[in-house]
């Protein structure tokens, strides 16, 4: 054995002795532990979003007026048909593809934004949202679009209503009516009944905008008499 081989052999013995001396008697070599990471849930589509109103008005380009346009009145008729017949596919073709459709059951309640893909299933889904506090009682209103919004739309479409372009038509209010957008709209107004002093008036205001030359609904807000 030459000197180089002997030196390497001795160095190996010394290193092995040092490692053995550092290990505590009876100790075991620790194995690495891998933490389980939470897995994300894949959602098919995204749920509608919620916000408070009135918010800061946002300007959207709208080169053509909607007042008196045959396309617009035909679109309102199609919306009415979709509501009265629970036709989700038809409703989805009327929702603005640019920004969806904001829906507020109360004028100062929560705004729920539905995209066209949401609107297709609004007559079927049981997805519940908080619509805000009921005027007067302060009770919170919670429920699906089908259970909360649709009955009130059906009610006004089944009564003698009138259409008013870019006018917040009402039958007398204890508050100031405001339209929190800078785009155009139509008021769908029921004047109420004399038997109730016309205090049962109701107005659904429908925001309408043109996208690629076609009119679409971008907002729906309900107004009525409040104590």
Q: Model segments located where?
A:
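Bacterial N-terminal signal peptides that target proteins for export
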Residues: 1-9
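Hydrophobic alpha-helical membrane-embedded or membrane-associated segments
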Residues: 8, 12-16
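Ser/Thr-rich, Proline-interspersed low-complexity disordered segments
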Residues: 15-69
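C-terminal-biased regions
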Residues: 48-77, 92-227
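Short helix-adjacent coil turns
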Residues: 78-91
């Amino acid at each position: 054995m030459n000197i180089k081989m002997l030196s390497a052999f001795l160095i190996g013995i010394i290193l092995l002795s040092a490692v053995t001396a550092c290990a505590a008697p009876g100790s075991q070599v620790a194995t690495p532990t891998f933490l389980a990471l939470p897995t994300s849930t894949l959602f098919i589509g995204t749920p509608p979003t919620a916000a408070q109103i009135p918010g800061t008005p946002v300007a959207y380009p709208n080169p053509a007026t909607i007042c008196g346009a045959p396309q617009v009145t035909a679109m309102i008729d199609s919306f009415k048909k979709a509501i009265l017949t629970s036709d989700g596919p038809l409703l989805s073709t009327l929702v603005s593809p640019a920004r969806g459709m904001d829906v507020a059951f109360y004028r100062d309640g929560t705004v729920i934004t539905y995209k066209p893909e949401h609107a297709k299933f609004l007559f079927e889904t049981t997805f519940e949202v908080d619509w805000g506090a009921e005027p007067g009682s302060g009770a919170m209103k919670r429920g699906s679009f089908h259970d909360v919004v649709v009955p009130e739309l059906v009610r006004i479409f089944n009564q003698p209503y009138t259409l008013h372009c870019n006018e917040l038509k009402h039958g007398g209010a204890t508050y100031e009516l405001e339209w929190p957008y800078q785009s155009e709209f139509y008021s769908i107004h029921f004047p109420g009944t004399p038997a109730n002093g016309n205090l049962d008036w109701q107005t659904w205001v429908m925001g309408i905008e043109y996208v690629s030359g076609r009119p679409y609904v971008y907002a729906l807000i309900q107004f009525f008499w409040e104590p």
